[in-house]
Amino acid sequence: MRQEKDSLGIVEVPEDKLYGAQTMRSRNFFSWGPELMPYEVIRALVWIKKCAAQANQDLGFLDSKHCDMIVAAADEILEGGFEEHFPLKVWQTGSGTQSNMNVNEVIANLAIRHHGGVLGSKDPIHPNDHVNKSQSSNDVFPTAMHIAAVISLKNKLIPALDHMIRVLDAKVEEFRHDVKIGRTHLMDAVPMTLGQEFSGYSSQLRHCLESIAFSLAHLYELAIGATAVGTGLNVPEGFVEKIIHYLRKETDEPFIPASNYFSALSCHDALVDAHGSLATLACALTKIATDLSFLGSGPRCGLGELFFPENEPGSSIMPGKVNPTQCEALQMVCAQVLGNNQTVIIGGSRGNFELNVMKPVIIYNFLQSVDLLSEGMRAFSEFFVKGLKVNKARLQDNINNSLMLVTALAPVLGYDKCSKAALKAFHESISLKEACLALGYLSEKEFDRLVVPENMVGNH
C-alpha cells in the first residue's frame, strides 16, 4: 500500500493502482452491490479530460507540456486495458463526483508514472488543477452521460433495431401469400395474410426507430461549461466552443452546447425522454414475442401456425419438446427495460434546485436498457425470426373451419341472416357452407363464389 493525501487527510491506496485518495475513500464508504459505473461513462469522462486539456491549452490556460501529458495518458486509457483502475460503484454521490475524480486521478497518476514521478505526488500533473481545469463534476458528469447515451444508441441499439426490421421485412415478403385467420380479442376474425401480420410488426419497430432517432437531438446538447450551478464560474471565455469542437472531432458526433445550462444540470429530461422511446420499443417487442409464441404453440394441440427453429431441447423431462425460448428471453429483457424506465423517471424527478442528484442510477439503467435491447433483438432476429416456417396445412384447416368467413356474405344476406348461419354452424358443429345450404340462403355454387378467403385480405 502507498499513502496519499487529500483535503481530509491520509488514505492508504493499493500500490499497483493508478487511482488515488478520493477514489479509495469512495471504495471504502460505497462498497455495496456489484454494479460498477458503466465503462461507457468512463470512456466519455476520459474524452472530456482530453478535450478539456486541448481547449485550455488553446486558450493559454494550460501549457503544452501538461496538455501533452494529459492527452497521452487519456489516449492510452482509451486504447483499453485499464478497467481495473475504475472500480467505483453506481451507488455513490448522486452527482457522479467520485467517478469524475477517479478519472482525474488515474489520468494524473498515469502521466506521473510515464515521467518518472511518484504516484500520488500530484507532480508534475495535479488531478484537480490540471486534469479537471475549467470543469466541475456537476457539468462533466452530465456531459459524459449524454456522450455515452448517444454513442450507445448509435453504435448498438439503432443498428440492432434496423437489422430486426430488415429481418421482419424479409418475412413479410416470404409470407405474403399465406392466407390465415386473423384474431381480435383472441377470437377468430376475418382472413388476412401472415405477411400482413408481420408487416404490422415491422411498422411498429419503424415507429420506434423514428422516435429513438428523434430523441438524439436533445442528447447532443452538452452541459460542459456550466460548472457548479450553471453560471459558468471559472470557465474562461471561449472554452465551451473549444471543448465542443474537440469532442465533436474525437467522437465524430454533432454535439452542441446546452441551450440552457441551468436545466442541463438540474434535470435529465433528454434521457428520460430517450428512455421513454426505449420503453415503447420494449412494449412493441413484448407484443411481437408474445404473438409469435402463441402462433407457434402446440405443435399439435395449440395454434400451431408457425414452426419454430429447433435451437435446443426445451425440457429436462419431456423428450422432443421445442420451446419459444428466444421469445421468453426477449420478454424478460423487455420487462427489465420497463422497470428501468420507472427508475429513470424517478431519477429524473430528483432535480433538487440546481442539481439532479441521481445521475449515476439514471445513466446506469439507460445503458443497461440499450445493451439488453440491442443484444436481445439481434439474438431474437438471428436465432428465431429467421428460422420461422409456416404450417400451411394448419392455416388451411383454420380457414376451412372459420365461422368469420360469414362476414363476406353480409353485403348479400345482411347481418341478421349471417349471424343466424354462423350460430347454427357453431351449435351444430357443421361448416358455414353447410349451415347456409341448410337454411336455404345460398346454393353451393353461390357460396363458393362469394366466400373466397384470398379475396378477403385486401391490398394492404
Curated annotation (Swiss-Prot):
Q: What is its EC number?
A: 4.2.1.2
Q: Which UniProt keywords apply?
A: Cytoplasm, Lyase, Tricarboxylic acid cycle
> Which GO MF term does the entry hold, naming one?
fumarate hydratase activity
Which GO cellular component terms are attached?
cytoplasm
Question: Which reactions is this enzyme annotated as catalysing?
Answer: (S)-malate = fumarate + H2O
Task: Tell me which Gene3D superfamilies the record gives.
Answer: Fumarase/aspartase (C-terminal domain), Fumarase/aspartase (Central domain), Fumarase/aspartase (N-terminal domain)
Per the record, the major location class is cytoplasm
- Enzyme class of the recorded protein, top EC level: lyase
Q: Which residues bind substrate?
A: 95-97, 126-129, 136-138, 184, 316, 321-323
Could you tell me which PROSITE patterns the record lists for this protein?
A: FUMARATE_LYASES
Q: Which family does it belong to?
A: Belongs to the class-II fumarase/aspartase family. Fumarase subfamily.
Concerning PANTHER family, the annotation shows:
ASPARTATEAMMONIA/ARGININOSUCCINATE/ADENYLOSUCCINATE LYASE, FUMARATE HYDRATASE, MITOCHONDRIAL
Its annotated function is as follows: Involved in the TCA cycle. Catalyzes the stereospecific interconversion of fumarate to L-malate.
Q: What else is known?
A: There are 2 substrate-binding sites: the catalytic A site, and the non-catalytic B site that may play a role in the transfer of substrate or product between the active site and the solvent. Alternatively, the B site may bind allosteric effectors.
Spell out the protein name for this chain: Fumarate hydratase class II
The species is Chlamydia pneumoniae
- Phylogenetic lineage: Bacteria, Pseudomonadati, Chlamydiota, Chlamydiia, Chlamydiales
